[in-house]
UniProtKB/Swiss-Prot annotation:
Disulfide bonds: none annotated. One of its GO terms (biological process) is vitamin E biosynthetic process. Involved in the synthesis of tocopherol (vitamin E). Catalyzes the condensation of homogentisate and phytyl diphosphate to form dimethylphytylhydrquinone. It comes from Oryza sativa subsp. japonica. This is Probable homogentisate phytyltransferase 2, chloroplastic. InterPro entries: AtHST-like, UbiA_prenyltransferase, UbiA_sf. CDD domains: PT_UbiA_HPT1.
């Protein structure tokens, strides 16, 4: 059995010898080979640390590594944060802002016209309606991204599916949840007519993107769908639902008729100019748009011209119907917005229609869209 015992370690043997007063035993076996001069000099410069010191160094290293791991972000929290960011980008925030501002402005207008009927119950119902509209918006823009992955890798690589931040399976789950949640809210809180309008909007958003229809391939059909959903259905539907919640039958007011016509034409401009930043990818995948057919410059001038005509018409309406509109708001606001689009078009021309300049021009059009709804309750 003695032959199976391990020989004592040098440090342990030395320690035992020092306590007993006897010299340390010499280990059996051949003597170690002589060290080379290079190793000898290295050993002289860097003497070995004692065994206890080495053991404590290993413990310190483990402790430091453990502290460094604890200081880093937890994997679950980082995953949830990334998922939240991807879902937010998946919703296309600029479209949500337009939907939210439009619905809030129209509800505010209906309440301004009937202040005696305001009660707190309407606030909750309006909130449900806003959530349903955002869900519908999320479904439409989400289904479009699912079927535009290859094109978005060229035109919009920052979108979550194209960037690989969101899987197609997760995207499908989100759009189904959006559609189901929005439909459930509308069915349980609003009447059959509003439910029918909501389903019509979802249907138009579906045939806009989904094969075999995919009407976005045809410029005229795409323009009509966008103008109908964002222009007519949103404004008419929200105003109708608000009056119904107030216990009133539907009746057009001059300001609501104005904003419906104005925004419908504005949505047509958005539909025309939305393809300007996407010309590169559309040409690569042979998607026919007005921008690929007529050129970026011509479409930019067409969109700006339609907006200027829209603003001129708004100013004319203020003069022709002073009893229905506040001229002191309508005239200066729309004149300033018209000057803004003229200036932005000039900036685009000076920039020689670079991709960054085109994107800035398109964002400015959306800002004008938001501005119209912000000022609408005041007109």
């Amino acid at each position: 059995m003695a032959s199976l015992a391990s020989p004592p370690l040098p440090c342990r043997a030395a320690a035992t010898a020092s306590r007993s007063g006897r010299p340390a035993p010499r280990l059996l076996g051949p003597p170690p080979p002589p060290a080379s001069p290079l190793l000898s000099s290295a050993s002289a410069r860097f003497p070995r640390a004692p065994c206890n010191a080495a053991r404590w160094s290993r413990r310190d290293a483990v402790r430091v590594c453990s502290q460094a791991g604890a200081a880093g972000p937890a994997p679950l929290s980082k995953t949830l944060s990334d998922l939240k960011d991807s879902c937010w980008r998946f919703l296309r925030p600029h479209t949500i802002r337009g939907t939210a501002l439009g619905s809030i402005a129209l509800v505010a207008r209906a309440l301004i016209e009937n202040p005696q009927l305001i009660n707190w119950w309407l606030v909750f119902k309006a909130f449900y309606g806003l959530v349903a509209l955002i869900c519908g918006n999320g479904y439409i823009v989400g289904i479009n991204q699912i079927y535009d992955i290859r094109i978005d890798k060229v035109n919009k690589p920052y979108l979550p599916i194209a960037a690989g931040d969101l899987s197609v399976q997760t995207a499908w789950l989100l759009v189904v949840l959006f559609a189901a949640a929005g439909f459930s809210i509308v069915v349980t809180n609003f009447g059959p007519f509003i439910t029918s309008l909501y389903c019509l909007g979802l249907f138009l958003g579906t045939i806009y993107s989904v094969p075999p229809f995919r009407l976005k391939r045809y410029p005229v059909a795409a323009f009509l769908i966008i103008a109908t959903v964002r222009g007519f259905l949103l404004n008419f539907g929200v105003y109708y639902a608000t009056r119904a919640a107030l216990g009133l039958t539907f009746q057009w007011s001059s300001p609501v008729a104005f904003i419906t016509c104005f925004v419908t034409l504005f949505a047509l401009v958005i539909a025309i100019t939305k393809d300007l930043p996407d010309v590169e990818g559309d040409r690569k995948y042979q998607i026919s748009t007005l921008a690929t057919k007529l050129g970026v410059r011509n479409i930019a001038f067409l969109g700006s011209g339609l907006l200027i005509a829209n603003y001129v018409a708004a100013i004319a309406v203020a003069f022709l119907m002073p009893q229905a509109f506040r001229r002191t708001v309508m005239v200066p606001v729309h004149a300033a917005l018209a000057v803004g689009i003229i200036f932005q078009t000039w900036v685009l021309e000076q920039a020689k229609y670079t991709k960054d300049a085109i994107s800035q021009y398109y964002r400015f059009i959306w800002n004008l869209f938001y501005a119209e709804y912000i000022f609408f309750p005041l007109i």
